[in-house]
Amino acid sequence: MPKSIIIKKNGGPEVLELQDVNVGSPGPDEIKVTNHAIGLNFIDTYHRSGLYPLTLPSGIGLEAAGKIDEVGPNVTEFNKGDNIAYASIPLGAYSQQRIIPTKIAVKVPDGISHKQAATLMTKGLTTNYLICKTYILKANETVLFLSLIHI
């Protein structure tokens, strides 16, 4: 049976609990994914600590990458065996296997590892938002991507 890390109360790392989960089958516009790598983000610590309150108990984690095990009805853009990455709610990326809506998943190109894909999603989306929405980057301007230097 797959396992998932959940929190039942707020606190430090000691509140993370490993539990067996019954994943089931995907519904319409959903995919069942086996995660091969997860991304760890500051927001995960905010959720765990209660700084960003959650309804408890709750899964935790926003981003991961893995392989599709099963596709639900109406899914045409993904197939069983596709490598994908995702970042968004619902929380629960700290799982061996889970079901996610297709709208939060993207295919991972050949040559990109699950580890790379899992760590790029939230940071990449944040960077895209900052340079395309918050401040429109202009020609000859310089940007330092501090959150991406670990890759």
Mark where each language-model region is.
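Glycine-rich beta-strand-centered segment in the early N-terminal region that forms part
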Residues: 22-39, 49-92
